[in-house]
Amino acid sequence: NYTIQDYVNDSISTFVDASNKANVPHPNIITESGRSLTAHHSVLIFEVLETTTLPSWEEEDKIADSDHELVKDLFQLWEKVNQSRMLETWHDAQQIREEALDKFSFGLIDLRTRAQIEKLFWSIAREVHIMSSKTKHIPDEIRQISRMLSDKYFCNFSLFQSLPDAWAIDQIFPIMPIHRLNEEPLRTATIQDMTCDSDGKIDNFISTRNSPHQIPVHSLKGKDSYYLGVFLVGAYQEILGDLHNLFGDTNAVHVSVDSEGYKIDQIIDGESIAEVLDYVQYNSKKMVRTVETWVTSSVKAGIISLEEGKEFLSNYRSGLYGYTYLE
């Protein structure tokens, strides 16, 4: 979100001001701008595994006389929402949802009612968001709805292993889909990694629009793979990465480019589960022997068949010596 000229101006102005105030000659400046020089050589590419979208009230959903009063109140808000009352409607919807969540936590409403509340609340949020886009002056509370409505794209990587600066110092990296570029991305999303950590997400992006907390993405197409690229990661991300949740080094491909095109120089396999377990003093060979002993005794005791034992051992070895990420 700044140019090289901006960067130079800010850096040099400090020296100029200090030199002028001290009435001394301007110095020769020698700098090593690490990220600027080295970041460009590396790109992180990962697959989107799954997505979640907030629920919505569908046409087939009906309100029954037996439904909870909070559901009926929220349904009336949704039916009557309009541009002139959108802020009031949003406040009322938030209040009803909060009351419903409190009652749910005390066991006073059931799971079905909770689901109805969620569907109606997020349907109201979408309506208010659409209406607000047609107004000149949007209240800050309404602006926040856009961020709340983003999908979550769960991706096959570890933020702490591959993009530690995004977590540690809020570094913003350029991120975008690397295919389907002839299609307009109609969804917006935040990125979630594979770790169990709530910090394992990216919700701050480079953006020329007023939506830096979400990224434009495409909807997934059935079982077709969908990949995102994170650029300018060559400045020490791989070196700084750690083994949070025991996700290891990723697969790497060295590519050289010349006037005639590109060629793949080297393919380096990422770490296996056995390798990362070794870091925390687990002996993979001993683990396999232990499982082999259990399988042998189970076959002899008639607990499992010989074929089941062979299949179990094959799957165990395959997992243990396989990639730490999903394959």
Per-range role (PLM):
Residues 18-24:
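Short helix-capping segments at alpha-helix termini
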Residues 4-18:
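Alpha-helix-loop-beta-strand connector modules within alpha/beta enzyme cores
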Residues 1-5, 52-54:
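Glycine-rich tight-turn/loop motif centered on a GG-T
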Residues 24-28, 33-327:
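Charged (often Lys/Glu-rich) extended helix/loop segments that serve as interaction or gating elements
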